[in-house]
Amino acid sequence: MAQRFKGSNLFLTALLCLASQGHAVGLGDMLERASQLSDKLHSLSTSLTNDLDTHFPPMGKILMPRPSMCHTASLQTPHDKDQALRVPESELLSLARALLLSWNDPLLLLTSEAPTLSHPQNGVIYSKTRELQDQSNSLSSGLDRLIHKIGSSSKSLSPLPFQGGDLGSDKNSRLINFYFLLSCFRRDSHKIDNFLKLLRCRAAKQDRC
């Protein structure tokens, strides 16, 4: 998996270098690359969730906060594909970027907490949270390039603030809150992935997106 992610970053770096050197990089190519990165981001968050599931307290999911408690829950996003199809490209891209940037601090918290997590696979979990950070940063750079290419949305969207400074004092609370935060990220990464794939389809002018 690490080799695949490394290859993705190298490909994106090549595209960004071409763009910075004045070489024309097509919108379709940029959206294709961004879609591949967002897909890997969501796949990695799913893999992390599966790792946590192997040793998760039986009452953990009952005690876990509801999805409405995610710090990004207040950001208004399309509920389904039909709604998303009616959103202008620049606004949909701005939504994806706002969602992604809202996770800068939470991903940093997850990475710092992972090594001491009360879980037998905390080493693997730590490695994957670092991968999440790297992938998120790569995708963020790609989205900045796309916004420059497509144009800014008339509805300027800012990242949502994250108020959580720690995951709790006891080991079970920390594990449950870690899982909850990751589940929120997994949900948002799925939205980002769907938005970018829809933009890729629309840019290709396909009849059915």
Curated annotation (Swiss-Prot):
Entry keyword Signal: yes
Keyword Signal recorded: yes
GO CC term, one of those recorded: extracellular space
Keywords: Disulfide bond, Hormone, Secreted, Signal
GO molecular function: hormone activity
Gene3D superfamilies, alphabetized: 1.20.1250.10
Listed Pfam families: Hormone_1
Span of the signal peptide: 1-24
InterPro entries: 4_helix_cytokine-like_core, Somatotropin/Prolactin, Somatotropin_CS
Organism superkingdom: Eukaryota
GO terms classed as biological process: positive regulation of cell population proliferation; positive regulation of receptor signaling pathway via JAK-STAT; response to nutrient levels
Cellular compartment(s): Secreted
Disulphide bridges, residue numbers: 70-184, 201-209
Chief place where the protein resides: secreted
Family: Belongs to the somatotropin/prolactin family.
Protein name: Prolactin
Species, as recorded: Anguilla japonica
